[in-house]
Amino acid sequence: MPPKGKGGKGAKGGAASGEAADKKAQTPKGGNAVKVRHILCEKHGKVMEAMEKLKSGVRFSEVATQYSEDKARQGGDLGWMTRGSMVGPFQDAAFALPVSTMDKPVYTDPPVKTKFGYHIIMVEGRK
C-alpha cells in the first residue's frame, strides 16, 4: 500500500508530465520554429521573374542570390525563426509550408505580400 501513498505525490508529478507531453505532442504539428529561406523583392514584376526561374529548375539559393533584395549573399537563408518574430502574412505562410530541400523545393506560389514587399518562402526545417 505505501506505493499508493507515493502515487498521490506521483499523480501531481504525472499531471506535470502530462502537460509536458501535451506540449511535445503539439510541437510536431505546427512547431515553434522554422528554418526559412526567402526571396524578397519590392516590385511584383521582379518577384515573378524569380518565380519563373524557380519553376524552370534553378536552385532556390541561386535565385535568391540573383533576385532577393534581402540576405541575398546567404542564398536567402534567414536561419531559425520563431513564432512571433516574423510579420503576420510571412509567419502564416512559413508555418503552413511543408519542409522541403534544395533538390525538391516547396515554396509559396503566389508570393506573399508584406509591408517589406513580395516574398517567395521556402522552409528547410521545423522544430
UniProtKB/Swiss-Prot annotation:
<dbReference type="GO" id="GO:0005819">
    <property type="term" value="C:spindle"/>
</dbReference>
<keyword id="KW-0413">Isomerase</keyword>
<dbReference type="InterPro" id="IPR043323">
    <property type="entry name" value="PIN4"/>
</dbReference>
<dbReference type="InterPro" id="IPR000297">
    <property type="entry name" value="PPIase_PpiC"/>
</dbReference>
<dbReference type="GO" id="GO:0005737">
    <property type="term" value="C:cytoplasm"/>
</dbReference>
<keyword id="KW-0238">DNA-binding</keyword>
<feature type="region of interest" description="Disordered">
    <location>
        <begin position="1"/>
        <end position="33"/>
    </location>
</feature>
<protein>
    <recommendedName>
        <fullName>Peptidyl-prolyl cis-trans isomerase NIMA-interacting 4</fullName>
        <ecNumber>5.2.1.8</ecNumber>
    </recommendedName>
</protein>
<dbReference type="GO" id="GO:0005730">
    <property type="term" value="C:nucleolus"/>
</dbReference>
<keyword id="KW-0539">Nucleus</keyword>
<dbReference type="InterPro" id="IPR046357">
    <property type="entry name" value="PPIase_dom_sf"/>
</dbReference>
<dbReference type="GO" id="GO:0003755">
    <property type="term" value="F:peptidyl-prolyl cis-trans isomerase activity"/>
</dbReference>
<dbReference type="GO" id="GO:0003677">
    <property type="term" value="F:DNA binding"/>
</dbReference>
<dbReference type="Pfam" id="PF13616">
    <property type="entry name" value="Rotamase_3"/>
</dbReference>
<keyword id="KW-0963">Cytoplasm</keyword>
<keyword id="KW-0206">Cytoskeleton</keyword>
<keyword id="KW-0697">Rotamase</keyword>
<dbReference type="GO" id="GO:0006364">
    <property type="term" value="P:rRNA processing"/>
</dbReference>
<feature type="domain" description="PpiC">
    <location>
        <begin position="31"/>
        <end position="125"/>
    </location>
</feature>
<comment type="similarity">
    <text>Belongs to the PpiC/parvulin rotamase family. PIN4 subfamily.</text>
</comment>
<comment type="function">
    <text>May be involved as a ribosomal RNA processing factor in ribosome biogenesis. Binds to DNA.</text>
</comment>
